[in-house]
Amino acid sequence: MKKIIEYPAEITFKTIFSRSDDIDAAIDEILIARGIAGSVTCAESRNGKFLSYTITAEFESETLLQNICGAISSITGFIMML
C-alpha cells in the first residue's frame, strides 16, 4: 500500500550519477529555479567513478516533487534515484 504523504513535507531522496564536474551546479540550478532551499550533500564512490547526492528539502506538493525529480533525472550522467 502506498504511503500517503501530507504536503508540505520534508522529503529526502538520493540520486546517483556517473562522475561529472557539472552535476553540482545543475542540481543547484534546478532547486533554485523552483524556489527550493534544501540540503544537498555529495559522496564519491570508492573508485571515484560515481557520485551520489542526498537531497533533503521541504516540498509544497507532490507535483513540485515530481517536477524536480524529473528535471534531476534528465541531467547527463544520471543513473538512478532512490
Cite the ranges covered by each PLM segment.
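Long, contiguous binding/interaction regions
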Residues: 1-52, 56-82
